[in-house]
Amino acid sequence: RSLKEVKDQSRIFGQVFLTYIEENAQILWEDVSESASDAVAGLLKQSQAKQGEQTESVSLDQIPEYSDSPYVEINGNVPSFSDEKSAGPAYEFYSELDSLGRCGYAESKITPELMPDEERGAIGMVKPTGWHTVKYENVDGRYLYNRCHLIGYQLTGENANKKNLITGTRYLNVTGMLPFENEVADYVHSTGNPCMYRVTPFFKGDELVARGVEMEAESVKDQKISFHVFVYNIQPGIEIDYTTGNSWEE
């Protein structure tokens, strides 16, 4: 099958079934017949598990202040994916934007078939909440902000998907998130095994720029990949107004 066909199917599982079933999980689970497909039955259970996982997520108040490291381990560095999700089909899911236009969590069961085989296209047309085009001499590459993929392009081939892009500092994108993305990508490429992956942006109140992102991953077959971290959306030497995205040198 082509990459487009695989992604279309994964989106059906992730964006149609999971969204619809999340709203009707209990009723559907009680009424589902023995003749229901294993995939649909599994998704029903996945949705129920997902609801529990999301409500148990760490809160921003529990995250320590930034202190020289781009990330901090949370929940004992243990991810919280359900067995039902891990055993289910490949999928990708991107939350709807909230009333302020902000991204919610993005999640996928990453497989080699979902990973792109072509270079990333243009994404400059997407303006995530809090976006400003601003340069500083003391920032690598000079641009303070990047359009940060929640699920990196190399993992699911999502390009200019506004549900998957947030305003993130160069430090968040390259120093913080990229090493974890590369770890997952290298594992899936080298083994062919699937890996669960979820990234959740953390916004404080009505702020338009996320304070950071929660990243979780777990390889399904051997647990060689397993992490649960919070990556800070900061830039050393730069102060950020997270309400507006405005910034200035310290």
Q: Which role fits each region the language model picked out?
A:
Residues F81-E250:
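Domain-level detector of nuclease and nuclease-like folds
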Residues S2-D83:
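N-terminal, intrinsically disordered, polar/charged segments of Gram-positive cell-envelope systems
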